[in-house]
Amino acid sequence: MKAYEDLLERLREIDLMGQIGSLLSWDQEVMMPKKAAPLRAEQLAWISKASHERLTDPKIGELLDEIEGSEELEEVQSANIRLVRKSFDRATKLPTDFVEEMAIHRSKSIVSWTEAREKGDFSIFRDDLSVSIDQARA
């Protein structure tokens, strides 16, 4: 089924972007110099935004609409489509700007968390934690 293959190709690109974001995050926590944090926040925000835009592309919704309920799908493919639909529906509820802001905040809060842990002073992280909680509730 061509629509299913098209969807898989789009999802592969989204997954690759997620893997790149994970590598950037890992590097930030393990090896990156502290002074590089603002640039890393920008990089992570960009990759999060681009990934979100691809996932919420109306073409993904069109492909899902075309594929859902197809008699041609195997059981595993049908399960995959249900999961993709759930991800698509959730993602489309979040504005891209919000996703970008979350990525920037998450990256910057790693810096304050690391400093708070090193100094044993968790008040350093309090404001970032508060913002994280507010974003999670939004």
Where are the regions a protein language model picked out?
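A well-structured
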Residues: 1-138
